[in-house]
């Protein structure tokens, strides 16, 4: 069964992507364009040259952070839907440090990043504490905290840190902006995200603490019987996942957007949840999924310019990938589906 489960986790996303592109090609053909040509420009727009590759990595960076946030929390069996709010809180604190505290250069960058991570972790801990000590539903709490964080950001860029008559904050000083990564349009935030993904993978699958955290996520009752501190791991999962999202928000501010403005987070939190589910909560696979979705978004611009196919076709492909993958992975967990494989294995034996 374990081998069948692994095959399903690999097979279903791959087939979902292929079917989604096939449906996208049919839609493009119905619109009167050449599907192969459109998809070729979609690829070129994302990976065709160094500039486009850097843009893809830059667009993937915040998605990687929110995907890793969801992967880590869900591995412990807690549903942190507040990645976007934690992302925003991290950016708010980084913006305050960057514009109001006279620390520049590497110390300034590190201070902003640390403030973002701490802020995101503490913001997530609100939901964790309410779940552990009051029995509240973490999904509802984290969604509510998303709205609060968004409204708080609005107060920041329209009042507290407003720059002139425009509802936005001042740009962060050049001294704390992130340097580029290998001369690409992406910044060093991209390799930082990759390193964090590797660290999460190592922690979850190569340490005893990570094993206990996953055990709590798989069966909290059995973990409690074996003496695991359930509260400790639940709170830790909220704190760490929130810190990851908060760090992502801080680095997005310092490396790409440079100021707080309406639409800063751009739905990164819920995108991360969807990508984590597609990746079956595996941090390394989550990185690949985030880059894939970023490539679709970046490449769709060239596809539209060259062939006239609107970028909404790329959005349709993304939505289909999510629906097919999540539905397929849910289906293989149904008892009837599992029994089918069990009977097949017995017949072969």
Where would I find each of the regions flagged by the language model?
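Cytosolic-side transmembrane-helix boundaries in multi-pass membrane proteins
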Residues: 1-17, 218, 225-232, 300-349
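Short, non-helical or kinked segments that cap or interrupt transmembrane helices
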Residues: 33-37, 74-91, 132-141, 212, ...
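Helix-loop-helix "hairpin" substructures at the membrane interface of multi-pass membrane proteins
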Residues: 183-259, 283-288
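Membrane-interfacial amphipathic/re-entrant helices at transmembrane-helix boundaries
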Residues: 1-67, 107
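Transmembrane helix-bundle core of multi-pass membrane transporters
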Residues: 50, 138-206, 313, 340, ...
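Transmembrane alpha-helical segments in multi-pass inner-membrane proteins
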Residues: 239-319
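Short loop segments and helix-boundary regions at transmembrane helix junctions
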Residues: 2-11, 74-82, 103-106, 110-167, ...
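Single transmembrane alpha-helix segments in multi-pass membrane proteins
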Residues: 27-31, 46-101, 117-136, 277-283, ...
